[in-house]
Amino acid sequence: MSSDPRQAPYSYQPSPAQYAREERPGPRLSTPNNRPYDTTFFRNYGVNPFVATEDEVYSTFGMDVDTASYTIARRFLQDGNMPDRESVRTEEFINYFDQDYYDMQDLFSIHVDGALSEFGRPNYHLLRVGVKARDVGFDGRKTANMVFVVDVSGSMDREDRLEMVKRNLYLLGENLKEGDRVGLVVYGSEGRIISDLTSDKQSIMDAVSRLHPGGSTNAEEGLKLAYKMASRGFEEGKINRIILCSDGVANVGRTGPKSILSRVKKFAEKGITLTTLGFGMGNYNDVLMEQLANSGDGSYYYIDRLSEAERLFKNGAGALLQVIGSDAKVQVEFNPDIVDRYRLLGYENRRLEADDFMDDSVDAGEVGAGQTVTALYEIRVKDQAIQNPNGFIGQVRIR
């Protein structure tokens, strides 16, 4: 049995270009003020094809709670442009919205439903598979040591970048839990420590007010200082998190992705995780920001407006900080007697082999308190199965 969905003989086959894992600037777009987006980087992850169940009954993927793709698209539209095609990641659009799954006592609850497909083809249905992590609330969140790494390079000298970052940090300061500690590192041409870890809210606010842009972008140096601070202040049993606020540009130092990503991954294995918050449009590196979060066992968000920050930081940022499941995976096993073929909508960069589901060494996704993961499948039900309303479509497992 082939585990490669692209080998399904009856499946829709995308063109080779759709599988190209290329990284390139998006098209030159005209904004209302005639400033182009010609240095905004996205990656093409292809499109999942249909898979025949006679070839593979398992669909496996890593859970993903990133939502940056949706808010980036919203920013494109706000500026009067259509979103770059490669910026659209279907699962991040779906997971941005509350699916209204009910709470249960377990760490995770599974929700499955479906309906006839709206695309009009006979025997095609849309299947929704949802997973919800238990919400711990403000009081239930562990206390946290948070080191913010703020890009203050010249590329951040815009209203929607550094000034937005500062407003976000002020907002977080108002929502800290007793026992939380915050440190602040900045980087431009070089990295600097602005404030060591402290629980004094006024000191935190004062440090934020001193942020000013200037210089080139030595992201690696800034992260290096942040990890040193986080390591010194590491406390077992607490949340130890680096939060990077940047437009993703890195142009000084050993800034090839491998150098930065390997450092991030090494510290994630020690319990110091990384979340990335993206700001700005034009000269924005979506690819790097997502890769950093993935390597750091964290999540990636794009802040296009202050209300988006309020959504993330509400209730003491429990969903942002408190991890309920690490390397979390979903596996759907389809019943080949009922389902002829299926197609997972989105999660192209989270696909796993069937055997990876039980392999704890395989990196997957992290899910925070109260967060939901939703996957949509387009499935074709066999003709004879239509006459058997008691047949089951399949089973859902999480790990």
Predicted regions and their residues:
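Long, highly charged amphipathic alpha-helices
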Residues: 72, 92, 167-171
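Sec-dependent signal peptide cleavage junction
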Residues: 1-30
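Extracytoplasmic
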Residues: 82-99
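An acidic, Ser/Thr-enriched
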Residues: 21-22, 26-87, 105-114, 119-127, ...
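Exposed acidic/Ser/Thr-rich ligand/metal-binding surfaces
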Residues: 111-328, 382-389
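Alpha-helix boundary/capping residues
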Residues: 77-80, 97-100, 211, 296, ...
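Juxtamembrane/interface motifs at transmembrane-helix termini
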Residues: 94, 204, 331-332
